[in-house]
């Protein structure tokens, strides 16, 4: 991937427009998790340290275009950002009528981009309006890279210079390292409740990886494809044939989809359900498979420890309930101990990594969510394509 990077630009005396993803959650009117704001600090600080003035833009929530409601206001985000930077960050509501006059080191924020008409439709005129504010446009919002919108794609076409911020460049470099030129053997973990939501990822990764570990409801569908009984476990019977094709594709290239030989079952999906370890052949009609068993976890852990590259998306069991967390914990710890380059993404995966205290031992943790999944699928990300076009 060829694209310009913010850290390679001379921004002295220039106005830099940064598209960040500061779409943070609120609870009782207060920001409950500022991870996304903190993730954007590196690019903002780089510009401040190098004599630029900074305009930040972000979306917040799901407002109706052309309408402004108090809950859509980015003012709390600007105030929190200001607290982290140690300076006042003013919100600009009328930036189209009154172009801001800024000094080096100033940081301001545009009002919520999603209230602007034409934002979601990637309106070129709106993109030009954003671009008119700056000398350099920086996209640092990997989480929205799979969407072609005026603040991510059209602005990149229109700005004098368009480049990737520190966070965006880090994501793209890590994903490129993991998927374009992976160290072998390459192992992927794809888990979740449904094959249907991850089918294109499974098919895409089956072309790339040496071992494809599946977990959760996805594994149950693959177990059905192998003719195993899964009791009343969550599975998709209509995708058994697709699962067989993926296993055949892996086998044809000398790889495999290693399925559990033992599992942890319960009679109910509840926090206090009794967990019982069983061989897969002993699963009863009224059993629900809620985790992989210790024998399977140990075998998969050995695979991960010997890997050159690991891509992880999804916990292999109901890790929120401690009695069904053993499988995910064993794999998380194996990845942490492995010399492999590891990249992990997806909300549940990040929650599991945090729960088991291995955050600092994962090679790269993607902030992307949907963008991370679409990259795994091999899809072109519009905002990234726009940066590549400008960097050519």
From Swiss-Prot:
Catalytic reactions of this protein: (2R)-3-phosphoglycerate + ATP = (2R)-3-phospho-glyceroyl phosphate + ADP
GO function terms (MF aspect): ADP binding; ATP binding; phosphoglycerate kinase activity
Predominant place of localization: cytoplasm
Gene Ontology CC terms: cytosol
Annotated GO biological process: gluconeogenesis; glycolytic process
Binding site for substrate: 21-23, 36, 59-62, 114, 147
tRNA processing listed as a keyword: no
Oligomeric and partner information: Monomer.
Family the entry assigns: Belongs to the phosphoglycerate kinase family.
Name the UniProt record assigns to this protein: Phosphoglycerate kinase
Organism: Neisseria meningitidis serogroup C / serotype 2a (strain ATCC 700532 / DSM 15464 / FAM18)
Gene that specifies this protein: pgk
């Amino acid at each position: 991937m060829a694209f310009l990077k913010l850290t390679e630009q001379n921004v002295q005396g220039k106005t830099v427009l940064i598209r960040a993803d500061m779409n943070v959650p609120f609870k009782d009117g207060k920001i409950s998790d500022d991870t996304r704001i903190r993730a954007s600090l590196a690019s903002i600080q780089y510009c401040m340290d190098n004599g630029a003035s900074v305009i930040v833009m972000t979306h917040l929530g799901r407002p109706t275009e052309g309408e402004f409601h108090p809950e859509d206001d980015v003012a709390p985000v600007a105030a929190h950002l200001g607290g982290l930077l140690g300076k006042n960050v003013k919100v600009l509501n009328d930036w189209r009528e009154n172009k801001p006059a800024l000094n080096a080191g100033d940081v301001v924020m545009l009002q919520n981009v999603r209230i602007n008409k034409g934002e979601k439709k990637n309106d070129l005129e709106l993109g030009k309006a954003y671009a008119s504010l700056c000398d350099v446009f920086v996209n640092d919002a990997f989480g929205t890279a799979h969407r072609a919108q005026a603040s991510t794609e059209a602005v990149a076409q229109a700005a004098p210079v368009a480049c990737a911020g520190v966070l965006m460049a880090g994501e793209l470099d890590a994903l490129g390292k993991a998927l374009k030129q992976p160290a072998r053997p390459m192992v992927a973990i794809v888990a979740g409740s449904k094959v249907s939501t991850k089918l294109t990822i499974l098919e895409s990764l089956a072309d790339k990886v040496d071992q494809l570990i599946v977990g959760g409801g996805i594994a149950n569908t693959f177990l059905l494809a192998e003719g195993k009984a899964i009791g009343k476990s969550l599975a998709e019977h209509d995708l058994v044939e697709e699962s067989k094709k993926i296993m055949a594709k892996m086998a044809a290239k000398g790889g495999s989809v290693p399925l559990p030989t033992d599992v942890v079952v319960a009679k109910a999906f509840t926090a206090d359900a009794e967990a019982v370890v069983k061989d897969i052949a002993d699963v009863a009609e009224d059993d629900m498979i809620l985790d992989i068993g210790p024998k399977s976890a140990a075998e998969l852990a050995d695979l991960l420890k010997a890997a050159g590259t690991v891509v992880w998306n999804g916990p292999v069991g109901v890790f929120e309930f401690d009695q069904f967390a053993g499988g995910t914990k064993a794999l998380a710890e194996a990845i942490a101990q492995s010399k492999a380059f590891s990249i992990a993404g997806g909300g549940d995966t990040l929650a599991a990594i945090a729960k088991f205290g291995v955050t600092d031992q994962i090679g790269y943790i993607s902030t992307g969510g949907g963008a991370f999944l679409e990259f795994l699928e091999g899809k072109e990300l519009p905002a990234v394509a726009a940066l590549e076009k400008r960097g050519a």
